[in-house]
């Protein structure tokens, strides 16, 4: 029996995980003690990107080709079906934002209507701290804040960051929410594919949004994924 290759090690871990895993999980689970490289995380990244036995579900989320049908069915993900693609993508990035927030020791919130949406294979309600916002302001503003995709709160239950995931929906709607919430000492973030950045800038740079223009940050999907993958390296401000 020949020596087990690095690729075979990664594939075996994927099998043990049910056929799929995040790159962050692979970095933690693959036994690299016998690897001679000084950058095993980079090696694992190259393996999943280049192996014909592995395919990308979403940035940072990989699966075995032999498990393709099983994995896509498990995630209720039908390639080419806009509704299922939107649902999975939205839940995936909400979940990443929740996980990043929790790693930073923030309290995390997602709207109650999203509690059954999946983050990979778990309902968002299982990973977030709450689906109910604390009463940090009057009801009119709370009602607006409750619709934000992800909210980070500090230890005093005050908002630190408002995140809106914009896969296909109108970015202006999220900017309007942020405008209404501008009096809080919190960050405002639009999370979307990099292809929507110009649209974001065009809609932000109008007179109505001048009060928040310098406070709203565009986070592309890859930046969120890379932050999640490198959480062990995070120290202080992450964006």
PLM features: residue spans?
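A short acidic, leucine-rich amphipathic alpha-helix
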Residues: 25-30
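Positively charged, polyanion-binding regions of nucleic-acid-associated proteins
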Residues: 1-24
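Charged, structured surface patches that assemble and position nucleic-acid processing machinery
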Residues: 208-239
